[in-house]
């Protein structure tokens, strides 16, 4: 059976020899991967640089702070 270039590209893109490898570590070693906290704290929010107000037509109006300061939300 002859493989064309398109067949070779299809096979190389759809099947990976690393996709379904068995984990050879014992269960006690694998279990240690999932111990401990499973979350991180959220990052601090950046302060807003402009204030957005909406007019009666539904269009936004952007107001910039004076002297490069930050606007409190």
UniProtKB/Swiss-Prot annotation:
Keywords, comma-separated and alphabetical: Antibiotic, Antimicrobial, Cytolysis, Fungicide, Hemolysis, Secreted, Signal
Species the sequence originates in: Metaphire guillelmi
GO CC terms: extracellular region
Places the protein is found: Secreted
Domain of life: Eukaryota
Region (Disordered): 25-48
Principal location class: secreted
Signal peptide start-end: 1-14
Primary role: Displays antimicrobial activity against the Gram-positive bacterium S.aureus ATCC 2592, the Gram-negative bacteria E.coli ATCC 25922 and P.aeruginosa ATCC 27853, and the fungus C.albicans ATCC 2002. Displays stronger activity against P.aeruginosa and S.aureus than E.coli. Displays very weak hemolytic activity.
Protein's GO biological process: defense response to bacterium; defense response to fungus; killing of cells of another organism
UniProt name for this protein: Antimicrobial peptide lumbricin-PG
